């Protein structure tokens, strides 16, 4: 972990998230900020043709499933949440409460690098609200509002 640059490598991510192959959707955190004004995180997911779901989605024209873009965004949100409150206790997770206003703007294909930007908005009654944006080469792929609860 490089705290000076506020980055996390895969080993750091594995300490925070319970997900493992083939469902770990964050490869690296390239930046996070935990100031009073804002709490944000930028992560990347390298989309490889070797991902198992490309065998069926779709064999003639592989497309990264939209639900997995949202999952990647949610995992980035989980990392941000744990960076805000510290390393999780054993068995402690952030669970999805809702995804709202999800919009998909273009397909993601093998070879793309998905950039995930998430931002903490607020917490109310134990439910935290975040916003997320996914881009490829600076082009908007997906945006959504995510809510989660720590359990």
From Swiss-Prot:
SUPFAM superfamilies: Thioesterase/thiol ester dehydrase-isomerase (SSF54637). One of its GO terms (molecular function) is (3R)-hydroxyacyl-[acyl-carrier-protein] dehydratase activity. It comes from the Bacteria. GO terms for biological process: fatty acid biosynthetic process; lipid A biosynthetic process. The active site is at 57. It catalyses: a (3R)-hydroxyacyl-[ACP] = a (2E)-enoyl-[ACP] + H2O. Transmembrane segments: none annotated. Keywords: Cytoplasm, Lipid A biosynthesis, Lipid biosynthesis, Lipid metabolism, Lyase. GO terms for cellular component: cytoplasm; membrane. InterPro entries: FabA_FabZ, FabZ, HotDog_dom_sf. It is found in: Cytoplasm. The keyword Lipid metabolism applies. Pfam families: FabA. Its EC number is 4.2.1.59. HAMAP family: FabZ. PANTHER family: 3-HYDROXYACYL-[ACYL-CARRIER-PROTEIN] DEHYDRATASE (PTHR30272:SF1). Involved in unsaturated fatty acids biosynthesis. Catalyzes the dehydration of short chain beta-hydroxyacyl-ACPs and long chain saturated and unsaturated beta-hydroxyacyl-ACPs. Belongs to the thioester dehydratase family. FabZ subfamily. This is 3-hydroxyacyl-[acyl-carrier-protein] dehydratase FabZ. It comes from Tolumonas auensis (strain DSM 9187 / NBRC 110442 / TA 4). The gene is fabZ.
């Amino acid at each position: 972990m490089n705290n000076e640059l506020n980055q996390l490598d895969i080993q750091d991510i594995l300490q925070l998230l319970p997900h493992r192959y083939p469902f770990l959707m964050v490869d690296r955190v390239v930046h996070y900020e935990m100031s009073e004004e804002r709490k944000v995180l930028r992560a990347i997911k390298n989309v490889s043709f070797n991902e198992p779901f490309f065998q069926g989605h779709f064999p003639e024209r592989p497309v990264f499933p939209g639900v997995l873009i949202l999952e990647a965004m949610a995992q980035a949100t989980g990392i941000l949440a744990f960076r805000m409150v510290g390393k999780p206790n054993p068995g402690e997770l952030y669970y999805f409460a809702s995804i709202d206003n999800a919009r998909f703007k273009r397909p993601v294909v093998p070879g793309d690098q998905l950039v995930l930007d998430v931002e903490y908005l607020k917490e109310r009654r134990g439910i935290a609200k975040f916003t997320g944006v996914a881009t490829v080469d600076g082009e908007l792929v997906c945006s959504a509002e995510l809510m989660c609860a720590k359990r």
